[in-house]
Protein backbone atom coordinates (compact mmCIF):
# COMPACT_ATOMS: atom_id res chain seq x y z
CA UNK A 1 0.00 0.00 0.00
CA UNK A 2 1.49 3.34 -1.00
CA UNK A 3 1.26 6.40 1.22
CA UNK A 4 -0.55 9.50 0.09
CA UNK A 5 1.13 12.81 0.91
CA UNK A 6 -0.57 16.12 1.58
CA UNK A 7 0.71 17.30 -1.76
CA UNK A 8 -1.12 14.42 -3.49
CA UNK A 9 -4.36 15.36 -1.72
CA UNK A 10 -3.99 19.02 -2.68
CA UNK A 11 -3.35 18.12 -6.34
CA UNK A 12 -6.43 15.88 -6.32
CA UNK A 13 -8.59 18.65 -4.82
CA UNK A 14 -7.30 21.18 -7.36
CA UNK A 15 -8.70 19.03 -10.15
CA UNK A 16 -12.21 18.80 -8.63
CA UNK A 17 -15.18 20.85 -9.86
CA UNK A 18 -17.04 23.26 -7.62
CA UNK A 19 -19.92 20.80 -7.26
CA UNK A 20 -17.54 18.00 -6.28
CA UNK A 21 -15.82 20.30 -3.74
CA UNK A 22 -19.18 21.22 -2.24
CA UNK A 23 -20.12 17.55 -1.85
CA UNK A 24 -16.69 16.81 -0.33
CA UNK A 25 -17.14 19.58 2.24
CA UNK A 26 -20.61 18.27 3.16
CA UNK A 27 -19.26 14.73 3.53
CA UNK A 28 -16.38 15.93 5.75
CA UNK A 29 -18.81 17.95 7.90
CA UNK A 30 -21.02 14.88 8.42
CA UNK A 31 -18.19 12.43 9.00
CA UNK A 32 -16.28 14.57 11.51
CA UNK A 33 -19.24 16.37 13.07
CA UNK A 34 -17.96 19.85 12.26
CA UNK A 35 -19.23 22.81 10.31
CA UNK A 36 -17.29 24.86 7.79
CA UNK A 37 -19.08 27.97 9.10
CA UNK A 38 -17.97 27.44 12.73
CA UNK A 39 -14.87 29.69 12.63
CA UNK A 40 -16.98 32.66 11.51
CA UNK A 41 -19.53 32.09 14.27
CA UNK A 42 -16.79 31.59 16.84
CA UNK A 43 -15.19 34.89 15.86
CA UNK A 44 -18.43 36.69 16.65
CA UNK A 45 -18.91 34.95 20.00
CA UNK A 46 -16.35 36.86 22.12
CA UNK A 47 -18.18 40.15 21.55
CA UNK A 48 -21.41 38.67 22.93
CA UNK A 49 -19.57 36.96 25.75
CA UNK A 50 -17.90 40.22 26.70
CA UNK A 51 -21.26 41.97 26.93
CA UNK A 52 -22.66 39.24 29.13
CA UNK A 53 -19.76 39.44 31.58
CA UNK A 54 -20.51 41.48 34.70
CA UNK A 55 -18.95 44.93 34.73
CA UNK A 56 -16.29 45.21 37.41
CA UNK A 57 -16.69 48.23 39.64
CA UNK A 58 -13.97 50.81 39.25
CA UNK A 59 -11.79 51.13 42.36
CA UNK A 60 -9.17 53.63 41.25
CA UNK A 61 -9.99 57.11 40.04
CA UNK A 62 -8.19 60.11 38.57
CA UNK A 63 -8.97 63.76 39.22
CA UNK A 64 -8.62 65.88 36.08
CA UNK A 65 -8.82 69.68 35.85
CA UNK A 66 -10.80 70.51 32.70
CA UNK A 67 -11.00 74.25 33.15
CA UNK A 68 -9.89 77.14 35.34
CA UNK A 69 -12.20 80.01 36.13
CA UNK A 70 -11.33 83.54 37.22
CA UNK A 71 -9.59 82.33 40.39
CA UNK A 72 -6.48 80.90 38.75
CA UNK A 73 -4.22 81.76 41.70
CA UNK A 74 -6.55 79.99 44.16
CA UNK A 75 -6.60 76.90 41.94
CA UNK A 76 -2.78 76.88 41.73
CA UNK A 77 -2.60 77.10 45.55
CA UNK A 78 -4.99 74.16 45.92
CA UNK A 79 -3.08 72.08 43.35
CA UNK A 80 0.16 72.77 45.26
CA UNK A 81 -1.46 71.74 48.55
CA UNK A 82 -2.95 68.56 47.09
CA UNK A 83 0.03 67.37 45.04
CA UNK A 84 3.02 68.84 46.94
CA UNK A 85 4.28 70.28 43.65
CA UNK A 86 6.38 73.41 43.41
CA UNK A 87 4.88 76.70 42.28
CA UNK A 88 6.10 76.40 38.67
CA UNK A 89 4.92 72.78 38.30
CA UNK A 90 1.50 73.57 39.80
CA UNK A 91 1.15 76.62 37.53
CA UNK A 92 2.08 74.55 34.45
CA UNK A 93 -0.47 71.87 35.41
CA UNK A 94 -3.24 74.44 35.83
CA UNK A 95 -2.41 76.24 32.57
CA UNK A 96 -2.30 73.05 30.48
CA UNK A 97 -5.85 71.82 30.91
CA UNK A 98 -6.98 69.14 30.85
CA UNK A 99 -4.42 67.99 33.39
CA UNK A 100 -4.38 65.07 35.80
CA UNK A 101 -4.01 66.28 39.38
CA UNK A 102 -3.95 62.86 41.02
CA UNK A 103 -4.47 59.35 39.68
CA UNK A 104 -5.04 55.84 41.04
CA UNK A 105 -6.76 57.06 44.20
CA UNK A 106 -9.89 55.78 46.00
CA UNK A 107 -13.27 57.29 45.13
CA UNK A 108 -13.74 59.15 48.42
CA UNK A 109 -10.32 60.81 48.14
CA UNK A 110 -11.04 61.74 44.50
CA UNK A 111 -14.36 63.31 45.49
CA UNK A 112 -12.71 65.29 48.31
CA UNK A 113 -10.02 66.62 45.96
CA UNK A 114 -12.63 67.47 43.32
CA UNK A 115 -14.63 69.39 45.93
CA UNK A 116 -11.53 71.37 47.02
CA UNK A 117 -10.65 72.29 43.46
CA UNK A 118 -14.24 73.19 42.57
CA UNK A 119 -14.48 75.49 45.58
CA UNK A 120 -11.22 77.13 44.46
CA UNK A 121 -12.80 77.85 41.06
CA UNK A 122 -11.69 74.96 38.84
CA UNK A 123 -13.82 72.73 36.65
CA UNK A 124 -13.02 69.12 37.54
CA UNK A 125 -13.81 65.60 36.29
CA UNK A 126 -13.40 62.32 38.12
CA UNK A 127 -12.43 59.52 35.78
Swiss-Prot record:
CDD domains in the record: Ribosomal_L7_L12
GO molecular function per UniProt: mRNA binding; structural constituent of ribosome
A Gene Ontology biological process term: translation
Keywords: Ribonucleoprotein, Ribosomal protein
GO cellular component, as recorded: cytosolic large ribosomal subunit
Gene3D superfamilies noted in UniProt: 3.30.1390.10, Single helix bin
SUPFAM superfamilies the record matches: ClpS-like, Ribosomal protein L7/12, oligomerisation (N-terminal) domain
Self-association and partners: Homodimer. Part of the ribosomal stalk of the 50S ribosomal subunit. Forms a multimeric L10(L12)X complex, where L10 forms an elongated spine to which 2 to 4 L12 dimers bind in a sequential fashion. Binds GTP-bound translation factors.
UniProt similarity note: Belongs to the bacterial ribosomal protein bL12 family.
Function as written in the Swiss-Prot or TrEMBL entry: Forms part of the ribosomal stalk which helps the ribosome interact with GTP-bound translation factors. Is thus essential for accurate translation.
NCBIfam families membership: L12 (TIGR00855)
Protein name: Large ribosomal subunit protein bL12
Species assigned in the record: Syntrophobacter fumaroxidans (strain DSM 10017 / MPOB)
